[in-house]
UniProtKB/Swiss-Prot annotation:
This is Putative ABC transporter ATP-binding protein MG187 homolog. Keywords: ATP-binding, Nucleotide-binding, Transport. Residues 13-464 form the ABC transporter domain. PANTHER family: MALTODEXTRIN IMPORT ATP-BINDING PROTEIN MSMX, OSMOPROTECTIVE COMPOUNDS UPTAKE ATP-BINDING PROTEIN GGTA. GO terms for molecular function: ATP binding; ATP hydrolysis activity. ATP binds at residues 45-52. It comes from Mycoplasma pneumoniae (strain ATCC 29342 / M129 / Subtype 1) (Mycoplasmoides pneumoniae). GO terms for cellular component: ATP-binding cassette (ABC) transporter complex, substrate-binding subunit-containing. Belongs to the ABC transporter superfamily. InterPro entries: AAA+_ATPase, ABC_transporter-like_ATP-bd, ABC_transporter-like_CS, ABC_transpr_MalK/UgpC-like, Mo/tungstate-bd_C_term_dom, NA-bd_OB-fold, P-loop_NTPase.
Length: 586
């Protein structure tokens, strides 16, 4: 059944039109996203861009307002976190201080029912294989053994197949109902937000009117004028307050009407659902799944008893090779405790923490605590590993070492990983794919080099790279780029005449050479020594530019600096949309 599930989709995770609306703000705005299997994908962006909310939607900690979350092609939008087969690592490792490292690692296994079921399934298969070897040695035909295998496979796979069917039907049958229910829950928050916005706007109007009246009173030259101003102020305040109450009543009426409409639509939808064939099929499957596993188990046991009575399970006819096979199979049959201990030790070896299993979290370093948190997350062998800024609590040197280790560990285990960070250096060094986000929207998806070399818009261009990309307003005349009416570079480009935004990174700004390139001058307003070179900020033509300065020269704030810009490193953006414009040299 795992094979069937894996074949259903080549994607480990899919977002389909995901929206998370908190009422007063939209945290995720209609995101579509695909994470391939065995890939490390980083959600990158500034604080408040929606990356942690996106991770929480994947984890099942936040329910989307609309849209679908798919794991391996199956809809898990309504599934709780414990049913999603994933591991979580947060910025704060949340290790239990009163438990040893070993106890922290194994704790999730004792509380996971699906883990127990997996152990039972493995033990059952091992015992089945042993029985088949003995029955074959005692004369059972290949047809009889094939039938026994079929019944065993059916016993294991059929309940899973039914569960997947139920999941798919739940999605298709209740999709519209779920969206209506989500909108219904949002109405009180949206109504409250509208009233708060109205109150803020009204208070602002009152302040403006009072400020103007106060200024007028200060210049009033008679008691009569003062009285007129006060009278007008009183009237205006009365009008503003009356308007506030009217608008507030309108807001309440509007949202009450919306509430009533959605309730009516929801009632109609629920009635319509019950008339569909899919709903009838779903009811039948839900009833059947309670009894079918027991029936399949009985069928298997009944046939096995027939073969056992016919051929017996005595091992006298077994060859040395068959006895050896049975011995190996018996090793697979283990108790829950033994299996958990074995699994935890295997994970500890992979993460190189076997020597600290007996220690408490308080007695190990931050890097070791982070590895313990990862061990606890992967000990259940999740399909997906989610990491929310796991390196933020580490110092700079340990952060670099740990991110290198995480990358190697992820590649060795081939586990699909979603990594959240605001640190572009982390994202560039660790990722197969980067999802750059801003204001709840995906700005660009691609490899680290794609985002750096071909940013989709100005946000991506300035967010990736340190220091950030320089972007200036330029104009195009007959293919020539002009900055403040002067040529920016000597190269011409295939661009229509008009305004254009031009970007270039700090290392594309160099000292002048005798090659005919336009030379610009500016004033150095800051210098930062990075060891291998310096980064300066130069003010030129009213714009501050990041430039690279070589250590071979002495620079001080206030120095006049001359520079040229390399034409091959230019990026072009539309002034209206800020989107990238692909341009060729003439």
């Amino acid at each position: 059944m795992e094979k069937i599930q894996a074949e259903k989709s080549q994607s480990a995770i899919e977002f389909k039109n995901i929206v998370v609306d908190f009422g007063e703000s939209i945290a995720i705005d209609n995101i579509n996203l695909t994470v391939k299997k065995k890939e490390l994908v980083t959600l990158l962006g500034p604080s408040g861009c929606g990356k942690t909310t996106s991770l929480s939607v994947i984890a099942g900690l936040i329910a989307p307002t609309s849209g679908q979350v798919l794991f391996n092609g199956y809809d898990v939008t309504k599934k709780p976190p414990q049913q999603r087969k994933l591991g979580l690592v947060f910025q704060n490792y949340a290790l239990y201080p009163h438990m040893s490292v070993f106890e922290n690692i194994v704790f999730p296994l004792y509380s996971d029912t699906s883990w127990r079921e997996a152990i039972f399934e493995k033990n059952t298969w091992a015992q089945h294989d042993i029985n088949c070897l003995i029955l074959k040695a005692n004369g059972a035909t290949s047809e009889e053994l094939a039938e026994l295998n079929r019944l065993m496979q059916q016993r294991i796979d059929e309940p899973k197949r039914m569960a997947y069917q139920i999941n798919d039907l739940m999605v298709s049958v209740f999709q519209k109902q779920s969206e209506l229910e989500a909108n219904l829950k949002l109405i009180p928050r949206k109504k409250q937000f509208a009233i708060i916005s109205l109150s803020k706007e009204t208070l602002s109007q009152i302040r403006d009117v009072e400020t103007k009246a106060k200024a007028a009173l200060e210049t009033a030259d008679s008691a009569e004028v003062e009285q007129t101003i006060k009278s007008e102020l009183k009237q205006k305040l009365s009008e503003i307050k009356a308007n506030y109450h009217d608008e507030k009543a309108n807001i309440k009426a509007y949202w009450w009407e919306m509430l009533a409409n959605i309730k009516t639509e929801l009632k109609t939808e629920k009635t319509a659902i019950k008339q569909t064939n899919d709903y009838a099929k779903l009811k039948e499957l839900k009833w059947k799944i309670h009894f079918e596993p027991l029936n399949l188990k009985k069928q298997y046991r009944s046939y096995f008893k027939q073969l056992k009575a016919k051929y017996s399970l005595k091992d006298g006819n077994l060859t040395e090779s068959e006895l050896s096979q049975i011995e190996e199979l018996q090793k697979r049959i283990v108790s829950l405790k033994d299996f958990i201990n074995r699994t935890a030790k295997e994970v500890a070896e992979k993460l190189e923490i076997t020597k600290i299993l007996h220690k408490r979290p308080a007695n190990i370093s931050g890097g070791q605590q982070q590895r313990v948190a990862i061990a606890r997350a992967i000990v259940r062998r999740p399909k997906v590993l989610l990491m929310d800024e796991p390196l933020s609590n580490l110092d700079a040197k340990l952060r670099v070492q740990t991110r290198q280790w995480i990358r190697k560990f992820q590649q060795d285990l081939q586990i699909t990983t979603v990594f959240v960070t605001h640190d572009q250096e982390e994202a560039m060094s660790i990722s197969d794919t980067i999802v750059c986000m801003s204001t709840g929207k995906v700005q660009q998806i691609g490899s680290p080099s794609e985002l750096y070399l071909k940013p989709a818009n100005e946000f991506v261009a300035t967010f990736l790279g340190s220091p950030e990309m320089n972007i200036v307003n330029a104009t195009v005349k007959a293919g020539q780029l002009l900055w403040n009416e002067n040529p920016l570079v000597k190269t011409k480009f295939d661009l229509p005449d008009g305004a254009i935004r031009v970007g270039f990174r700090y290392d594309e700004v160099t000292a002048p050479k005798n090659d005919g390139s336009p030379v610009f001058s500016g004033t150095l307003i800051s210098v930062e020594n990075l060891g291998k070179h310096m980064v300066g900020v130069v003010e030129s033509n009213g714009v501050q530019l990041n430039v690279r300065l070589e250590l071979s020269h002495q620079f001080e704030v206030g120095n006049a600096v001359k520079f040229t810009i390399k034409p091959n490193g230019l990026h072009f953006f539309d002034p209206q949309t800020t989107q990238r414009v692909e341009v060729k040299h003439v």
